[in-house]
C-alpha cells in the first residue's frame, strides 16, 4: 500500500507563537527550523521507501524541503485544515492509497514507534491516529487519504474519532509516548527540559541561546 507522508510547515516567522514570551522571535524560529529539518532527516534515514510531501506557503521552507528530497505543495491559503485537504487531493491524484500526516514539531522521533504505526493492518476505508498529550492529533493515517474531513484544533484527536464513527469508518487509536509530545506551549517546554537525548538536548540549547 503506497503511503504518502505529509508534513505541513509554516513560515518560521509565523511558527510557535504560543511560546511567546517564553522564547524570543529568533529562538522560536530556530526551534521550528531545527525540528523541521530533524523531521525530514528522520524520514529520509529510516523510511526512504515512503514518499515525503511538505505543504507550505513559504518559499524558504520549500527550498529546505527540496534539499532533503521531499516534494513540495505550495498552499497559500491560511489554516492547517486547508493545507492538509490540499495534501489529500495531491495524494489521491498521485495514486497513494494512504496518507500519514505528521507535524514538524515532535520533540523526539522514535523509529520503533513509526515502524509500529506503519505496520498496523489498515482496512479500506480506515483511520489510525496517535493523540498528543493534550488530545491534539500528532499522527493521522488515513486510507484512502481523504477518508475523513480534517478537524484540527482543540481536542482534535477526539473530533477525528467522532467523525470516523459517524461515517462508520474503522478508527484505531494508538498511544505512542514519544510521538505524543509536540512543542507548542510553555508546558511542552517544561517537559522538553526533562528529556536527555542528544536531539532534545540540542532543542533545549536552542531555547536558551538562539
From Swiss-Prot:
One MF annotation (Gene Ontology) recorded for this entry: phospholactate guanylyltransferase activity
Keywords recorded for this protein, A-Z: GTP-binding, Nucleotide-binding, Nucleotidyltransferase, Transferase
EC number: 2.7.7.106
EC class: transferase
Enzymatic reactions: (2R)-3-phosphoglycerate + GTP + H(+) = 3-[(R)-glyceryl]-diphospho-5'-guanosine + diphosphate
Gene Ontology annotations of biological process type: F420-0 metabolic process
Domain of life, per lineage: Bacteria
Pathway as given in its UniProt record: Cofactor biosynthesis; coenzyme F420 biosynthesis
Pfam (any one): CofC
Family: Belongs to the CofC family.
Function: Guanylyltransferase that catalyzes the activation of (2R)-3-phosphoglycerate (3PG) as 3-[(R)-glyceryl]-diphospho-5'-guanosine, via the condensation of 3PG with GTP. It is involved in the biosynthesis of a derivative of the hydride carrier cofactor coenzyme F420, 3PG-F420.
Listed name of the protein: 3-phospho-D-glycerate guanylyltransferase
Lineage, broadest ranks: Bacteria, Pseudomonadati, Pseudomonadota, Gammaproteobacteria, Alteromonadales
Encoding gene per record: fbiD
Amino acid at each position: 500500500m503506497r503511503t504518502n507522508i505529509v508534513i505541513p510547515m509554516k513560515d518560521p516567522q509565523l511558527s510557535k507563537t504560543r511560546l511567546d514570551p517564553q522564547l524570543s522571535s529568533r529562538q522560536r524560529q530556530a526551534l521550528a527550523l531545527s525540528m523541521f529539518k530533524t523531521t525530514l532527516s528522520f524520514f529520509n534515514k529510516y523510511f526512504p521507501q515512503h514518499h515525503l510531501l511538505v505543504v507550505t506557503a513559504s518559499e524558504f521552507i520549500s527550498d529546505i524541503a527540496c534539499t532533503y528530497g521531499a516534494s513540495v505543495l505550495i498552499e497559500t491559503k491560511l489554516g492547517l485544515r486547508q493545507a492538509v485537504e490540499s495534501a489529500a487531493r495531491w495524494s489521491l491524484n498521485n495514486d497513494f492509497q494512504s496518507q500519514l500526516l505528521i507535524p514538524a514539531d515532535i520533540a523526539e522521533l522514535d523509529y520503533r514507534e513509526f515502524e509500529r504505526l506503519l505496520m498496523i493492518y489498515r482496512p479500506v476505508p480506515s483511520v489510525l491516529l496517535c493523540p498528543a498529550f493534550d488530545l491534539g492529533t500528532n499522527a493521522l493515517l488515513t486510507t484512502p487519504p481523504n477518508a475523513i474531513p480534517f478537524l484540527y484544533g482543540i481536542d482534535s484527536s477526539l473530533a477525528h474519532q467522532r467523525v470516523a464513527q459517524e461515517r462508520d469508518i474503522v478508527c484505531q487509536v494508538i498511544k505512542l509516548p514519544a510521538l505524543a509530545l509536540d512543542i507548542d506551549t510553555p508546558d511542552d517546554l517544561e517537559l522538553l527540559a526533562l528529556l536527555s537525548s542528544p536531539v532534545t538536548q540540542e532543542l533545549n540549547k536552542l531555547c536558551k541561546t538562539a
